[in-house]
Structure formats: C-alpha cells, structure tokens
C-alpha cells in the first residue's frame, strides 16, 4: 500500500484548540488522496483531471520560457533555480506554483485546480514587489536589479511565476510561402 506522508507542519498536539485538528484532518485527507493518485501536487491538493493537467503543462511551459529568457540575459538570476530545488516539490509541472503559493501563505486545506491555485497565489502575492522585477522581463534592467533578483531568490521565483501567470501570450509566428 502507498505511504501517506504529510507536507505541512501539524503543530502542537497537547494544547487543544478546535482549528488545528480540523486543519490536520483536512491536510491528512488530501495527503491520502495524493498517496492513492486521486489528486496531484505536493503541498496543495490539485485536481488531476484533463483540464487542470493541461493547464499545469501550459503553466510550466510558460514559466520555463519566461525563466529561460531572463536567465539568458541575466545569468545571475540562476539562484531562482536553487530556490525551486530547495522547495522540494515533486510534481514538476506544478513545482514553481506550489513553492510560491506556500511562500505567500495560500491555504493548503482547499482543493484547487491549476487555475484556482494560480489565482490564489496572485491574490496573496505582493503585486508592487512583483512589478519591481518587470525590467528583468522587459530586458531593460540594470545590474542592480539583476543582483537583487539573485539576492532574493524566493521573491524572484514569485516574480517569475507572477510573470508566467499574468503576461499576455505571444502570438505564434508561422511562415507563409506567399510572403
């Protein structure tokens, strides 16, 4: 049988208050569903149906494209990779989103789709702080902004996810023989 393992700190067991046990039961329920393959994600219970899974794959592709573009221009931002590795999220497609959702305090006792988890992150993140990294995404940042991203890898990881979730999609370029 699968091993059920929790991702979250469960708190003290001796002082009794009704909320921590309720939270622990909810987290345990999702950990059990995860162990039996009924939900995906590591820290969050995320729907594993076809729509949510397609959204997760699309999110990861956008995240990777944003990260690659920034890293090519500003190699010092590689520290965001370290922040992602240290988060130890096992679902590769959702790992960046789960890591930043945990950083900003998104509620782990809710059942999410990829889209609703992304929206929960956007609702909780510091938008002004995320916008401060915009010059890196536009390719117009100075060395100081790149150094800030390197010094704050978790915050920059949040900015990468924010950019992947909020940037308009670029139109697909196709070649036409008639042109």
Can you name each region flagged by the protein language model?
Residues 1-179:
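Patatin-like phospholipase
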